[in-house]
Amino acid sequence: MKPAYFISDLHLSEKHPELTALLLRFLRSSAAGQARAVYILGDLFDFWVGDDEVSELNTSVAREIRKLSDKGVAVFFVRGNRDFLIGQDFCRQAGMTLLPDYSVLDLFGCKTLICHGDTLCTDDRAYQRFRKIVHRKRLQKLFLMLPLKWRTRLATKIRRVSKMEKQVKPADIMDVNAAFTARQVRAFGAERLIHGHTHREHIHHENGFTRIVLGDWHNDYASILRVDGDGAVFVPLEKY
């Protein structure tokens, strides 16, 4: 049976064209073209200020995802903490299906819960408070009404502050809370969880389920999770 592929945390930006080149290479590969589905679990872009922003980066990525979708490969997207403002307009342009924060898939007979992963990091209370605020629909609507230049400037400032705060936060609070994560998996009746966000690529076997953490992409290393009837395995992008 055709495999499914999972990626997250590419953090594409015009400052790092090499990462965009890696993604385009994968999307154009024969492996991607023969997949049953490709799942992008958030933070595809380093930041997103609205679907109305037109750039060479956004356009080229949407174009290549659309080409893959037009081949009959289903492409799904879950918003991340950096690109949570991606909306239906961009997803339609790219031929992607926008999924909610949590979704349960039947992958080759294994009930699998997928999400970006930031909602699982409940020990980082400051971030969870911030997330609750910026996910308010009314606030998002007001933000998207601002001129594009203002939105970009504000997003840049928020990113700068976030980066500074991250440098002084204890590493453990930026990982998932094990007890909360286990409860979520049980609540959805899943046997396996796939998420990104923490950048700690690993396959864990814990609390009666499998937890797979997707890694982030760098110019010297990027991996893709391949899931098929034999299980799940990380494959270096260089093999595609």
From Swiss-Prot:
Its main location: membrane. It is a peripheral membrane protein. Pathway: Glycolipid biosynthesis; lipid IV(A) biosynthesis; lipid IV(A) from (3R)-3-hydroxytetradecanoyl-[acyl-carrier-protein] and UDP-N-acetyl-alpha-D-glucosamine: step 4/6. It catalyses: UDP-2-N,3-O-bis[(3R)-3-hydroxytetradecanoyl]-alpha-D-glucosamine + H2O = 2-N,3-O-bis[(3R)-3-hydroxytetradecanoyl]-alpha-D-glucosaminyl 1-phosphate + UMP + 2 H(+). The keyword Lipid metabolism applies. Its EC number is 3.6.1.54. Substrate binds at N81, R82, D124, S162, K166, K169, H197. Mn(2+) 2 binds at D43, N81, H116, H197. Gene3D superfamilies: 3.60.21.10. GO terms for biological process: lipid A biosynthetic process. Belongs to the LpxH family. This is UDP-2,3-diacylglucosamine hydrolase.
